[in-house]
């Protein structure tokens, strides 16, 4: 299992020794040994690897990883280059185009966002191939709740983008009045037309960041 190497490491060190995590680790060892699990074991913590704690400006919460071959690589909503853009991400790009005029790219690889301080965090970090929510309730929620609590403790103002009921359930962890929450329905084709389209999260995020003296995000994902 990959161990954290940046400033998240001391902050999350004690989580790795808690009974829930030790149990989760044993479960995952067996799952990776006997089944096809996504993402690759070495990509599980990529959201934390790509976005150090000190650099977090925006959080986009997802649910669990994509469960198709070659899609998930540890960042919520993101897929590896060369993989078709999933429907929810296609709707995110459509809203980004309508909001800021960004062209719709030929890939869904969101590492550029992560490297600018956008924490792309799923609340569950692993999944069985072809079985959505198969690792729900196994312990990841305790771990990712702690990540959200740590971001909540930051002095620097952070924008939380909470799309859909699952993400909005985490609002109770965001108690620091410095931070800014933007809520909308999930970008899934089942709900995007009910208020995701037109809520302009990207321009609103940048307006807030600029208001508090932080660099805005360059949201354009380039063609590969």
Curated annotation (Swiss-Prot):
<comment type="function">
    <text>Excises uracil residues from the DNA which can arise as a result of misincorporation of dUMP residues by DNA polymerase or due to deamination of cytosine.</text>
</comment>
<dbReference type="Pfam" id="PF03167">
    <property type="entry name" value="UDG"/>
</dbReference>
<dbReference type="InterPro" id="IPR002043">
    <property type="entry name" value="UDG_fam1"/>
</dbReference>
<comment type="similarity">
    <text>Belongs to the uracil-DNA glycosylase (UDG) superfamily. UNG family.</text>
</comment>
<dbReference type="InterPro" id="IPR036895">
    <property type="entry name" value="Uracil-DNA_glycosylase-like_sf"/>
</dbReference>
<dbReference type="InterPro" id="IPR018085">
    <property type="entry name" value="Ura-DNA_Glyclase_AS"/>
</dbReference>
<keyword id="KW-0234">DNA repair</keyword>
<dbReference type="GO" id="GO:0005737">
    <property type="term" value="C:cytoplasm"/>
</dbReference>
<keyword id="KW-0227">DNA damage</keyword>
<feature type="active site" description="Proton acceptor">
    <location>
        <position position="64"/>
    </location>
</feature>
<keyword id="KW-0963">Cytoplasm</keyword>
<dbReference type="GO" id="GO:0004844">
    <property type="term" value="F:uracil DNA N-glycosylase activity"/>
</dbReference>
<dbReference type="GO" id="GO:0097510">
    <property type="term" value="P:base-excision repair, AP site formation via deaminated base removal"/>
</dbReference>
<dbReference type="InterPro" id="IPR005122">
    <property type="entry name" value="Uracil-DNA_glycosylase-like"/>
</dbReference>
<protein>
    <recommendedName>
        <fullName>Uracil-DNA glycosylase</fullName>
        <ecNumber>3.2.2.27</ecNumber>
    </recommendedName>
</protein>
<keyword id="KW-0378">Hydrolase</keyword>
């Amino acid at each position: 299992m990959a161990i954290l190497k940046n400033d998240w490491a001391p902050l999350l060190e004690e989580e790795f020794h808690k009974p829930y995590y030790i149990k989760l680790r044993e479960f995952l060892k067996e799952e990776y040994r006997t089944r096809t699990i996504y993402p690759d074991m070495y990509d599980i913590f990529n959201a934390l690897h790509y976005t150090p704690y000190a650099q977090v400006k925006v959080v986009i919460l997802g649910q669990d990883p994509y469960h198709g071959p070659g899609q998930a690589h540890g960042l919520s909503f993101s897929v590896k280059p060369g993989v078709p853009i999933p429907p929810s991400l296609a709707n995110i790009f459509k809203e980004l185009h309508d909001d800021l005029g960004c062209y719709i790219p030929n890939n869904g690889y969101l590492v550029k966002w992560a490297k600018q301080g956008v924490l792309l965090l799923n609340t569950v970090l692993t999944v069985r191939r072809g079985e959505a929510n198969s690792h729900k309730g196994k312990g990841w929620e305790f771990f990712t709740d702690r990540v959200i609590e740590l971001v909540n403790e930051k002095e620097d103002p952070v924008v939380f983008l909470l799309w859909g009921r699952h993400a909005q359930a985490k609002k109770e962890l965001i108690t620091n009045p410095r931070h800014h929450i933007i809520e909308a329905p999930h970008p899934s084709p089942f709900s995007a037309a009910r208020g995701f389209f037109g809520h302009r999260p990207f321009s609103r995020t940048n307006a807030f960041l600029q208001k508090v003296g932080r660099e805005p995000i360059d949201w354009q994902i380039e063609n590969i």
